[in-house]
């Protein structure tokens, strides 16, 4: 903040107070449903142009795209200009990279692939996202929490926190509960410190 944007005043206790006379020139706006998950691991809905200043400070190396549709072109351009690798995990299903419906749950193979990318510290800092940052992102983060040893009540509470007033999807919660965490192959030499 420049001196023209703020003035320093002294109060009765001789401590300094900063009075802001005009707003900052750069707006820092996080993506929809943004939240840190673990150190250098974040979740959100699809970032847009107004979120680029915020994302810049995260120094992202990888974005894990879980939506069943292609991301917006400006999002892909931003990733390309900033050397951010985008992993299109949500566009695949058991059959092919086509015919994936937005309302379909993620397959176990898709969740497994997403978790293996998350459990590799070489991909960090990493953002996990889908269109709104709710159900698909919530599924993967819920399965990650199970991998971390969280109890199901805590996993469900975190999932529901991001689904809003419409609530969660019971089928998603059942998928998180039944997911075979032992199917995830993790290289112990590449695990993030918070997973050990």
From Swiss-Prot:
Top EC class of this enzyme: hydrolase
GO molecular function: protein tyrosine phosphatase activity
Keywords per UniProt: Cytoplasm, Hydrolase, Protein phosphatase, Stress response
EC number from the UniProt entry: 3.1.3.48
GO cellular component, as recorded: cytoplasm
Annotated InterPro entries: PFA-DSPs (IPR020428), Prot-tyrosine_phosphatase-like (IPR029021), Siw14-like (IPR004861), TYR_PHOSPHATASE_DUAL_dom (IPR020422)
GO BP term, pick one: cellular response to oxidative stress
Active site: 130 (phosphocysteine intermediate)
Subcellular locations according to the entry: Cytoplasm
Record's keyword annotation contains Oxidoreductase: no
Metal-binding listed as a keyword: no
PROSITE patterns, sorted: TYR_PHOSPHATASE_DUAL
Reactions performed catalytically: O-phospho-L-tyrosyl-[protein] + H2O = L-tyrosyl-[protein] + phosphate
Residues in Tyrosine-protein phosphatase domain copies: 33-192
Task of the protein: Putative tyrosine-protein phosphatase required for protection against superoxide stress.
Family: Belongs to the protein-tyrosine phosphatase family.
Protein name per its UniProtKB record: Putative tyrosine-protein phosphatase OCA1
Organism: Debaryomyces hansenii (strain ATCC 36239 / CBS 767 / BCRC 21394 / JCM 1990 / NBRC 0083 / IGC 2968)
């Amino acid at each position: 903040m420049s001196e023209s944007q703020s003035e320093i005043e002294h109060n009765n206790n001789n401590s300094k107070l900063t009075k802001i006379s005009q707003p900052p020139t750069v707006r820092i706006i996080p993506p929809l449903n943004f939240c840190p998950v673990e150190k250098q691991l974040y979740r959100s809905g699809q970032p847009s142009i107004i979120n680029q200043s915020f994302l810049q400070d995260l120094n992202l190396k990888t974005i894990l795209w879980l939506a069943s549709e292609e991301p917006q072109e400006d999002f892909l351009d931003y990733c390309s200009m900033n050397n951010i690798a985008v992993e299109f995990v949500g566009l695949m299903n058991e059959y092919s990279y086509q015919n994936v419906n937005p309302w379909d749950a993620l397959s176990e193979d898709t969740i497994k692939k997403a978790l293996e990318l998350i459990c590799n510290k070489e991909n960090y800092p990493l953002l996990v996202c889908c269109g709104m940052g709710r159900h698909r992102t919530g599924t993967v983060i819920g399965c990650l929490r199970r991998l971390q040893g969280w109890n199901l009540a805590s996993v469900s509470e975190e999932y529901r926190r991001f689904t809003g007033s419409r609530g969660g999807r019971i089928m998603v919660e059942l998928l998180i509960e039944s997911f075979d965490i032992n199917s995830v192959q993790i290289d112990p030499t590449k695990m993030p410190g918070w997973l050990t």
